[in-house]
Amino acid sequence: MKAQKGFTLIELMIVVAIIGILAAIAIPQYQNYVARSEGASALATINPLKTTVEESLSRGIAGSKILIGTTASTADTTYVGIDEKANKLGTVAVTIKDTGDGTVKFTFATGQSSPKNAGKEITLNRTAEGVWTCTSTQEEMFIPKGCNKP
């Protein structure tokens, strides 16, 4: 009698079924992980801008003269040091009023970020008194630490 070599069709089908079950669990978890990491990346992109805004306001530069871009700052205008598209996941916008209140906002781009984040925003809000808060329109499970649902 010959010794058996290889696997039977049933054994191979069982292995394929097990791999399919594992993939059905792992893929959604990975997509959630990606969405959470994108939120952290967006917040890390805009968080340093708080320092630039505060420094500009303390030098007496009015909020409307705090602009997005990497151009060299002048005596009466501050460029925040990053481009609007500094992070490939979306765009950055800075809107500070002359009174000192305003926002630094990151908007996730459709097609560049995960579908779970597309079109969502992370916003750093500044009050005229200089208090910063963070809000996000992302689903609760994807909001980075330190931010809240509006």
UniProtKB/Swiss-Prot annotation:
What residues bear N-methylphenylalanine in this entry? 7
Taken from the UniProt record, the cysteine pairs bridged by disulfide bonds within this chain are: 134-147
Which PROSITE patterns does its entry note?
PROKAR_NTER_METHYL
Q: SUPFAM superfamilies annotated for this entry?
A: Pili subunits
The GO cellular component terms are: membrane; type IV pilus
Kindly give the InterPro entries that the UniProt entry links to this protein: N_methyl_site (IPR012902), Pilin (IPR001082), Pilin-like (IPR045584), T4P/T2SS_Core (IPR050470)
Chief place of localization: other
Q: Which residues form the propeptide?
A: 1-6
**Top-rank taxon, per record:** Bacteria
Q: How does it sit in the membrane?
A: Single-pass membrane protein
Q: Keyword Membrane on this protein?
A: yes
Locate the transmembrane regions by residue number. 7-27
Localization, UniProt? Fimbrium; Membrane
GO terms of biological process kind:
cell adhesion; type IV pilus-dependent motility
Q: Does the keyword Membrane apply?
A: yes
Q: What assembly does the database describe for this protein?
A: The pili are polar flexible filaments of about 5.4 nanometers diameter and 2.5 micrometers average length; they consist of only a single polypeptide chain arranged in a helical configuration of five subunits per turn in the assembled pilus.
Entry-linked NCBIfam families: IV_pilin_GFxxxE (TIGR02532)
The identity of this protein, by name, is Fimbrial protein
Q: Which organism is it from?
A: Pseudomonas aeruginosa
Gene that codes for this?
A: pilA
